[in-house]
């Protein structure tokens, strides 16, 4: 198998990264160990190479208006320097991918450029889908990553570390805010302009940075010198699951609607604009979905994994989509789908794990919420 390498691949190996195949890329699953990496992000700061993810630039006349036809979230709610999380839908309201849209415009009335970050596993299909629907309207799509680096710096100390390295104040940048930040000492050409967004996939404060390969490699080494712990896919998964953040392909897919996935807050049916799958979602909003994604806490230390059956009165009623041992809570947690009648908080079901039944209780999501948001 010919796996792709990010510009940080050799630096990840040098830092002790244990590499595994992921979505066609050779990526680090862990460095010092999952628990240490997880705790570093929860308590201090950690960094992730996420350069495997897709980054697209949309340019043209009012690209937001044309992209609106493909997503259920009112894009007029964001302006220049702002971003939103949403989902890409098909005609039946099924989720093709989840993504973050960044408005790169200079004013809200005349936004000519957007940035979209998409999942690595969906990068090719998303690009084809977007081109199919946007190019006829005169919207140009291009690879904004351009073999560069996408790096996530996450944790309560992320702001201090990034301010120290950039010399700029970032504390006032709001959640889902973004701007260009000038860094010195990241390459032959000073300063290096870095796209910095206050976004992440861990449930902690933090930033995601897009920059050229040379500058990205230099920044990685500077962060290591600052004592920032490199983190792999393993801790990224436990962190996002504690925060009840969805993993596309596991917790939702093309056969899942936003209402089923607990993402109904992304569907703005009050806006007049038509969008892909609107009719199906209007009907589901009126009737209610027949199943829902729920958070579960398990008794004991058994771990529920993707695909494990959920049982009620010894009958299979659903499946686990994601599960792990929570380092922060010291409990087994999981996400899974249950019939709506069984999806109420406090209800008990069972998970079948290697032939044995383990009690699981439906709980409120997220499982973990960082102290500043409590």
UniProtKB/Swiss-Prot annotation:
Any Gene Ontology biological process: glycine decarboxylation via glycine cleavage system
UniProt cross-references to InterPro entries, sorted A to Z: GCS_T (IPR006223), GCS_T_bac (IPR022903), GCST_C (IPR013977), GCV_T_N (IPR006222), GcvT/YgfZ/DmdA (IPR028896), GcvT/YgfZ_C (IPR029043), TrmE/GcvT_dom1 (IPR027266)
Keyword Zinc: no
Any Pfam family: GCV_T_C
Cellular component per GO, a single term: cytosol
Class of enzymatic activity (EC top level): transferase
GO molecular function, one term: transaminase activity
Keywords: Aminotransferase, Transferase
Catalysis performed (reactions): N(6)-[(R)-S(8)-aminomethyldihydrolipoyl]-L-lysyl-[protein] + (6S)-5,6,7,8-tetrahydrofolate = N(6)-[(R)-dihydrolipoyl]-L-lysyl-[protein] + (6R)-5,10-methylene-5,6,7,8-tetrahydrofolate + NH4(+)
Gene3D superfamilies: Aminomethyltransferase beta-barrel domains (3.30.70.1400), Aminomethyltransferase fragment (4.10.1250.10), Probable tRNA modification gtpase trme, domain 1 (3.30.1360.120)
The UniProt record lists the keyword Transferase: yes
Domain of life: Bacteria
EC number assigned by the record: 2.1.2.10
PANTHER family for the chain: AMINOMETHYLTRANSFERASE, AMINOMETHYLTRANSFERASE, MITOCHONDRIAL
Subunit relationships: The glycine cleavage system is composed of four proteins: P, T, L and H.
NCBIfam families membership: gcvT (TIGR00528), PRK00389.1 (NF001567)
Family the UniProt entry places it in: Belongs to the GcvT family.
Function of the protein: The glycine cleavage system catalyzes the degradation of glycine.
UniProt-recorded name of the protein: Aminomethyltransferase
């Amino acid at each position: 198998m010919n796996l792709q390498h990010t510009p940080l691949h050799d630096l990840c190996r040098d830092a002790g990264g244990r590499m595994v195949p992921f979505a066609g890329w050779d990526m680090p699953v862990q460095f010092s160990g999952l628990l240490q990496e997880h705790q570093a992000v929860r308590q201090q700061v950690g960094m992730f190479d996420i350069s495997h993810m897709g980054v697209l630039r949309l340019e043209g006349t009012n690209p937001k208006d044309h992209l609106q036809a493909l997503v259920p979230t009112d894009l007029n709610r964001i302006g220049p320097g702002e971003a939103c999380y949403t989902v890409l839908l098909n005609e039946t309201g099924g989720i093709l991918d989840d993504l973050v849209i960044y408005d790169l415009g200079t004013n809200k009335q005349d936004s000519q450029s957007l940035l979209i970050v998409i999942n690595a596993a969906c990068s090719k299909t998303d690009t084809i889908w977007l081109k199919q629907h946007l190019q006829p309207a005169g919207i140009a799509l291009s690879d904004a990553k351009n073999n560069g680096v996408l790096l996530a710096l996450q944790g309560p100390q992320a702001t201090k570390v990034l301010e120290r390295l950039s010399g700029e104040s970032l504390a006032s940048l709001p959640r889902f805010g973004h701007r260009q930040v000038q860094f010195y000492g990241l390459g032959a050409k000073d300063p290096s302009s870095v796209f910095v967004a206050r976004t992440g996939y861990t449930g902690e404060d933090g930033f995601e940075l897009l920059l050229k390969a040379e500058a990205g490699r230099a920044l990685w080494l500077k962060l290591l010198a600052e004592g920032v712990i490199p983190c792999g896919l393993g801790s990224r998964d436990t962190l996002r699951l504690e925060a009840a953040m969805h993993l596309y392909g596991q917790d939702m897919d093309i056969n899942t609607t936003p209402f089923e996935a607990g993402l109904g807050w992304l569907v703005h049916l009050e806006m007049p604009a038509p969008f892909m799958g609107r009719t199906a979602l209007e009907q589901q909003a009126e009737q209610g979905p027949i199943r829902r994604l729920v958070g579960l806490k398990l008794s004991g230390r058994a771990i529920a994994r993707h695909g494990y059956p959920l049982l009620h009165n010894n009958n299979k009623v659903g499946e686990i989509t994601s599960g792990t041992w929570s380092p922060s809570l010291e409990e087994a947690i999981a996400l899974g789908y249950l019939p709506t009648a069984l999806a109420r908080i406090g209800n008990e079901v069972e998970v079948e794990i290697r032939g044995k039944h383990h009690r699981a209780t439906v709980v409120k999501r997220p499982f973990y919420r960082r102290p500043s948001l409590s």
